[in-house]
Amino acid sequence: IMSKCHYKNECAYFKMRNKLKEGNRYIRLNEYKPKVIIVNQDMLMMNFKKLTFGKESLIYDDPCMLIIDEVHNLEEKQRANMTKTINSKTVINKIKEGANRVGSRSRYLKNIKMIEDWFNLQKDSAKSEIYKNGNCLSTGRVDIKPVSHHQMAKLISMTKEIVEEFDVNNIAVFKQSSLVSNEQLEIANNLLTLFKNLQNNSDKYIFWTEITKQDQIDISFCPNNIAETLRKTVFSTSYPVVCLSATITNKTNNENSYEYIKEIIGFKGYEEDIKYNDFPYKESRLYIPPNLPKFDKRDVKYYEEIGKHIFELASQNKGGTLILFTAKDDIDGVYNDLSKRKFNKTIYVDDGSKSQNEIIESFKKTKGVILGTGVFWEGIDLKNELLTLLVIVRLPFPTIDPITKYKITKLNDSNEAVIVPEMIIKLKQGVGRLVRTKQDKGLLVLLDSRMNKPIYKHKEAVLDALPIKNMIHKDEVKDFLNNI
């Protein structure tokens, strides 16, 4: 598929793959052992996947050591690598194309209609679930709507008929080319596999549904044994593996600090070592305004109150401002409020119209205000006056989606055994945007009303996770921002 892409000559990923191939060829021919090879986690996971299936390695496969940075992302990267996703529009179109090629579309109209009806049922169910949760599901992943055993049996039977027809016509015997493409056959086979797994209520897979931006439906499924797969591949090599991240400890003392991350990536490890940086966090300040609007009341009044806090804080800030959200709808609500105010700052909205890099490059020129979510929680490196005010609107608890539900079940514990460690990891990632060098200092603001409660059960865990400990009151904010 990659070789057929019209944009392959401009694609950075394609160019990198080719360079790696050339590098591997040079290594083999010259018996040269490279000292350092840098790849992203997506490519690393794909490399281990290819090795598992006995295919040629993408990268040099006999290193002296593997160092994995930002290891808190490894589980999700491996899950993405093992996930099969079926798009409703693509499935229907490819099945229709294949049926047309073999002259059997009219014969399979009933089959195709039943498959379409099932996808529409999933879309309606997903939309209902999202709206029920205030349209604020951060991952967008919801459970698949079950159908009766009889209905699923019919779906399997009808899809199997299509697969068998495509399979026969995929083989070119007396013709120059097959009638049905490999892609059409693969898509039909993936759909059949999905239906069979759903029918068997397989406990080896996690299933979920997502609504796409084009109002289509994506059905995804992946093996649930992510930790076991990582243990057998990445962590069972003949060379040592070192895992790094600034955010994977979940306790202030050293005892069992890595317990959660080790559990979800299947890495038991032989040695643990917590290193502390010497950034001057004492020079920065933490501010939690009193009387914040209730965090779970996402109405016009809520966005007005949050918008007011952001407006007042950012207006006093001479450097750049980053506002981190946990849901796109919250960005929309706050932006609608800010756009009505006489704001002397340029606002950059993470609405998908521009890439993160495009937003960052424009932001550097104006020291404005970024309203961001998702990727803006990590990987941003804005030093000195480029970022002096960081506002976190809500504590970044993960959504209880099908994947989180499975993790909770696996740990045989309450929701909090999963959602609290994941919230702390995400929170640390976000807070880490503010102080990037020994010369940096800034103001960290939390706008989550739960932090106003003296007896909030996770308050101590949140405060312990923050490297910035010195709190200030409202009447100190202006002077602090003016003196940065």
Can you annotate each of these PLM segments?
Residues 1-18, 31, 35, 48-66, ...:
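Conserved coupling segment at the C-terminus of the helicase ATP-binding
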Residues 15, 20-22, 373:
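Phosphate-interacting basic helix/loop segments used at nucleotide- and nucleic-acid interfaces
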Residues 290-300, 351-452:
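Conserved RecA-like P-loop NTPase helicase motor core
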Residues 445-484:
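N-terminal targeting/trafficking signals and adjacent low-complexity tails
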Residues 268-273, 339-360:
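Conserved RecA-like helicase motor-core motifs
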Residues 42-43, 72-73, 377:
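Catalytic acidic motif of RecA-like/P-loop NTPases
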Residues 35-41:
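Extended, Lys/Arg-enriched charged tracts that mediate electrostatic binding to polyanionic substrates
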